[in-house]
Regions:
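Catalytic cores of nucleotide-sugar-dependent glycosyltransferases that transfer UDP/GDP/TDP-activated
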Residues: 1-172
Length: 172
């Protein structure tokens, strides 16, 4: 990210394929000024797919030392688990629905990570895919600074972004 000059406030990760990103952001890169305020969210679509390999294999491609392969970090049942790492280190965790967020805290659906999901339940939220176009219509939405439509969104939508950045204390 520093190479391309892009410094997001939040990095949104999806599933085991991106599980190492929260690990790097929260721990490995945290001391660096560029990454120090960056947050991460990991979304779980299907807990069955966790990205599990033996520890040595993950160490080879990740560069992570033994420290990270403990039961409270990436280790799960003597293997390395990339999704578990993402869940442990992410600032927030989302799933595809409120129901799924509750289900994965139970042994039957938890795929061996139900205890971790219960431990992180304060950071876990279900978000249903899709949108309610009646309620979230930028032409009529009373909660945004500037209404817009398909004809003027390039000019008007940016005003909402600037207002939100200002409200959140971010650089405008």
């Amino acid at each position: 990210l520093p190479v391309i000059g892009f410094q997001p406030d939040v990095v949104h990760c999806h599933d085991w394929q991106t599980g190492l990103i929260p690990v790097y952001l929260k721990d490995r890169f945290r001391g660096g000024e560029f990454f120090c305020n960056m947050k991460s969210v990991i979304t779980i679509h299907n807990l069955k797919f966790q990205g599990v390999w033996d520890v040595k294999t993950i160490q080879r491609f990740s560069g992570l030392p033994n420290y990270y392969f403990a039961p409270d970090k990436l280790e799960a049942y003597k293997d390395g688990n990339l999704l578990k790492g993402g869940i442990v280190y992410a600032d927030a965790i989302t799933t595809v629905s409120d129901t799924y967020a509750e289900e994965i805290k139970m042994p039957f659906y938890g795929e061996g990570l139900d205890g971790l999901m219960r431990a992180r339940s304060n950071s876990l939220r279900g978000i249903v895919n899709g949108i309610d176009y009646e309620e979230f219509n930028p032409e009529t939405d009373k909660l945004i600074v500037q209404n817009y439509n398909v004809d003027n969104f390039r000019k008007e939508k940016v005003k909402n972004k600037r207002a939100l950045q200002s409200e959140l204390g971010l650089v405008v």
